[in-house]
Amino acid sequence: RQWSRGLGDVYKRQVLPKPSVNRLIQHRLAEKDFVNKLNIRTTRYVSVEKKSDIETLEDFLPGILKTTTMGYDGKGQYPIKKIEDLDSLNIDFSKGYILEKLVKLKKEISVIITRYGNNNFEIYEPIENTHQDQILKHSKIPAEISKKILDQSKNWAQTIAEELKYIGTLCVEFFIDRNENLYAVSYTHLTLPTISC
């Protein structure tokens, strides 16, 4: 993924989405900090630099410890229910990590938004995702969600795209908890292999 780092310098023509945006969305801690500044709810999270940090963070458990960069489809992710779980996990703390507190999850959805031209948008119907062992198993559209969640997820996706000044197609992932609260999880591209016709 680090190919994006030098694109702005290599090409004289403008590269879209901007390489700076790609760098932001490759860093889990940075992307959550960005969304929080927009008053968009995320799950509780905290930066972790060493094992002893987690030993003082019982309030964030049960949670998932994730590398701040790289890792996808369950890679670089460690579910932790209690402090003692750390003893059985082989974690390389020379890397940066983020600890995210688990929510009582009802379902996960994604909103696809395309921003183009003079601040024009196309926002598509939310997609409902099903995971197994932290890996996406299948997706369906439209998602079975309330009108409140439908409107809020589309609004938040548009806000994120606007504030990023994003040009292109963006996928914003959300959690819905059992009390119908919405949480922004991450934002990334949507790849063709996920779509079946």
How should each PLM-predicted stretch be described?
Residues R1-Y11, H189-C197:
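Single conserved hydrophobic/aromatic residue that forms the stacking wall/gate
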Residues R5-D59, M70-G71:
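Conserved N-proximal alpha/beta basic substrate-recognition cap immediately N-terminal to
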Residues V15-L16, T43, I64, I98-E100, ...:
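Structural detector of well-ordered beta-strand residues that form the stable sheet scaffold
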Residues I54, A157, T188:
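Aromatic/hydrophobic pocket-lining residues that form π-stacking "cages" and hydrophobic walls in ligand
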Residues I80-D177:
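Internal nucleotide-binding/catalytic subdomain
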Residues E180-Y187:
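A short beta-strand motif that forms the metal-chelation/ATP-contact edge
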